[in-house]
Amino acid sequence: MSVNSWIKALVDAIRAAVVRRQTNADRPTTTEADDRAYVQNLYRVVLQREPAETEIAHWVAILRRGGSDREVFNRILTSGEYKARNKILPGHPIGHYYSPIVDPDEARKYARIDYGISPEKILGVRISLSEMQEVWGRLSAFVKSSDFPMNKESRCRYYAINEIFPIGDAAILRAMILLNKPHRIIEIGSGFSSACMLDTLDEAQMADTRLTFIEPDPQRLRELLRRSDAKRCTLIEKPVQAVDPRIFEELQQNDILFIDSTHVMKTGSDVNFELFQALPRLRQGVLIHFHDIQYPFEYPNEWVYNRKYSWNEIYGLRAFLMYNSDFAIEFFNSLFIGRHRDLIEKTYAPILKNPGASIWIRKLRQ
């Protein structure tokens, strides 16, 4: 619900309460069903949720004993739950020019996105398809040998039919690990990508590679891990912003920093921390992955207009890379796969079912 709609609904609820008081001054002349509906509507409008049956019964009992509508309304409006919700309401409504939430009408008017733009026309960012072709030459044998199960199987932690980390991303991740043979991987935002990493390390018998997962909500990760994984995995169960940034200085050449976090830049966000604290601390030769980065550094219309995503990480990363000779784009999934579909089909056709949205960057200089 937008802020404007929320305010309108709140005003309507207040007016409804006033009408009830004016027309039912001698309480109670309404039915129990009326009182029940009144309580449900208050919860939906003021607290933005459905009330539990015990909550409905509590407030209906007060109303049936002669309690006023205003009393119930005011008690809900001054509750700790409402105050907790109210403190995070935006200072400016959706659609206001100060709001970071995407206004679809404004986006359609000004975005003018050319998804087929040539890489050399993206100003300030060096994107070399010929260099990606060379990287593909080193990756392709590993990609070709991919054997991901489509559905959950006991032999693997990862399976391709999931809504989080598609097969195209998994195939390139596996190939990057097999090519670079990292001794250490730090992952920010864990789950199916972690499963792919562990399957790959098992396959390559890379028992000495250590993984650190930074994940404040690790339920999905725990469901995918095996008991034996604890020997080489460290789980930091907190937001990356709460982690000592010196941990990123421990990564060495060909080690991997894998980022798949909230995709949102804002005051105190994980994406800000990653761009401003983690990346500058990396040593030369470290390989960096960002997920959900689509070419040409724009989000698909489906994400913006239908799913209503107001992500902005992609623009922060683009700005970070502009005129930045300390980092280089090594591989850009959506760009390369989109331009070389015939090559991908000959190498490992399942990628074309869902190419994914990964970008791989390398730190060139300290």
What kind of feature is each model-predicted range?
Residues 5-87:
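Substrate/cofactor-recognition hotspot
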Residues 11, 27, 83-289, 293-366:
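A short alpha-helical cap/connector motif
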